Amino acid sequence: MKRLTVHLIPHTHWDREWYLTSAGFTVRLADALDRVLALLERDPSLRFHLDGQAVLVEDYLAVRPDARPRLEALARTGRLAIGPWYVLADELIPGGESLIRNLLIGRRVAGAAGGRCLTLYCPDAFGHPGIGPDLAAEFGLTAAVVWRGVGAAAGHRDRFRWTGRGKTSLVVLHLPPAGYEIGIGLVDDPADLATAWGRLRSEFAERATTDHVAVFIGADHHEPSDRLIGLPDRLAAIDARSSFRFSTLDE
């Protein structure tokens, strides 16, 4: 059995308006980020990825202004990953100037909150422009994560190098077919943890380019589960050949 170093990435994916109004989703966001801050303060090993879009910080602090010091303290330590986008972008419909402005504002908002994620996070776009690596380089972004818009043919590995129109390139992590929800089963019924991990392990080992794999734990509009606490230790007890830790994308 191949030894793996497993990076657990707690996160959420957030549409600001969809099957609820923007006001309805803002109420849910406030509750979700209340829980995020509480769990991060409870467990110093925990990390949380805030969906790559800094606007969620603005939305949250608009209704929870008293939470600013706590949020900024966690962002400064890198445990709460914010940005680099202002809002997650459709990368093909908007013009290049729109994408640049998006990243400019994201850098400002994330920086003001305490820190910026340096990974170009593009999980939900249905295509990616040829200038992607060049755009990332201009903003000091050192890697990328994509899901849709790449393809998922059998045999695809989990990493590739994306070369832009010039000589710029960056390493890309391509999420598995189940995308950013693939690890949500790890915080469901504890009695099923061994089965859930066994199923995921086989899939990740088959696609892995190196012995490091990233398992996203979250879903659309989901709050983080209390079962995140202690999850690396529970998984290590099941799979003693591998190591488990909470990580951010930059880590």
Where are these regions (language model features)?
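Catalytic-domain carbohydrate-binding cleft regions of carbohydrate-active enzymes
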Residues: 1-251
